[in-house]
Structures are given as C-alpha cells and as structure tokens.
Amino acid sequence: MNLQGNQYIGFTPSGAGQQVFQAINPVNGEKLMPLFKEATVEEIALAGEKASNAFQLYRLTSGAEKAHFLTLIAEHIEKLGDDLLQRCHLETGLPLPRITGERGRTVGQLKLFAALLKEGSWVNASIDLAQSDRQPLPKPDIRSMQIALGPVAVFGASNFPFAYSTAGGDTASALAVGCPVIVKAHPAHIKTSTLVASAIQKAIADCKMPQYVFQHVSAVEHSLNEIDLGKVLVQDEAIAAVGFTGSRNGGRALLD
C-alpha cells in the first residue's frame, strides 16, 4: 500500500474525491504532509459492494486461518516500528511512552482473538437432540451457533489512535468472527491510520484472504459536499453492524 492520500478499496487506491485535508500537529499547529483526499459517495458505495461480496468467502474461513491472519496483522504492525510511533506522536501530541503502550495493547488484542479462534468455544455451539417419543408432542432436533453478521463499519476514535481505531478491538473482533471491515479513519491521525491499514493489507496478501475483507476510507466530518460521510457509510445497505467510539453527539447522529 503506497501512502498517496487515497481511499483503499481492497488493494486498489481510489482518489475520485476533489476535496483534500491533512493532519495538524496539536502541539504547535503545524500542518502535516501528505494531503489526503476525502472519499466520495460513490467510493463508499463501491466499498460496501466489495465488502458484501467478500463476506460470502470470508465467512467460510476456518478459525485456524483467521487466527493466522490476525497474528500476521499484529506482526506487521510491530514491524512498522518507530516510524509508526513517531508519526502518531506528531498527529496526536500524545507522549511516546503512552503511544508505545497502546500499540502493545492493540497487538495484544489481536493475538488474544487469535488464541480464542484456535480454542473455538466462542461459537457457543449447542445441540439439543430430538425426542421423537416425547408426549404430548415430539421434540425436534435443535442446533445453534454464533455466526458472522456481515460487513462492519468501524469509526476510528480521536483519543485512542491504535486501540480503538484501524486495527483496534472493533476491527479485531469483526475480523475474528468472519466479518469484513470498512474503517472510516479519524482525520486527526489519518496517516497513522493509513500506516496501520498497510499492515492489515500485507497480512491479507500473505494469507491470501479476499482482498476486500478490509477497506479504508477517510474524510473530515461534515465536509463531504454537505453530506456526512459517516451517515453515508452507516446507511449503506451492505453494512450489518457498526463499531463507534466517540462523543455522544456523534454516536446519536449515526444512530438517528
């Protein structure tokens, strides 16, 4: 993944938008390069369509395969090293020890879900056998288990650039259960988000997962030709669930 400031619809960079924005260092007000293009309604629709198609394949992936996938995401995030930490520091103003700890938490979450997938009990499988001779009516055979819902939209949080953002708990849990993810990156730490997205894309390629199992879009709130990108994403017919961490007003706006 080249950091060109575009959306990433699968492995394909898409730069249809005309509006651009950039992160700003909150400590000194410096505008940080590069410029990033805002997504368009059409790009969001395409991402939803591709995620829906990917779901039909990804939902059938075994627990062991998904565990390997999550483990590789964690490893690729770690391989980003100090470049990731330094950029996050510039974009958020958070101290490096705090950022380093949060990266460790994020990597740990991914590995935790990988271990859970290998163990397997998360599906809560239940088998209630039939009793054909039960009176007054026979009892049917009833079996159940947890299954994936479909594509999930995840919104990055401003104050947790790793643990509640691109590869945070919402993304990790969705990918673990078999749901493709479309991340709406937080504009305050957009390049940090894009770097983490590149780690996920590398893991997808390494594992030969469907390329549209993860997609990454971005925009500044309320600037998408007066259409809120978040609402466009949430209202897309492909989206089955939403992971959001943020203000009450922001959450209510998406819910309503």
Model-identified regions with their sequence ranges:
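N-terminal Rossmann-like NAD(P)+-binding subdomain of aldehyde/semialdehyde dehydrogenases
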Residues: 1-137, 206
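Rossmann-like NAD(P) dinucleotide-binding subdomain of oxidoreductase/dehydrogenase enzymes
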Residues: 122-256
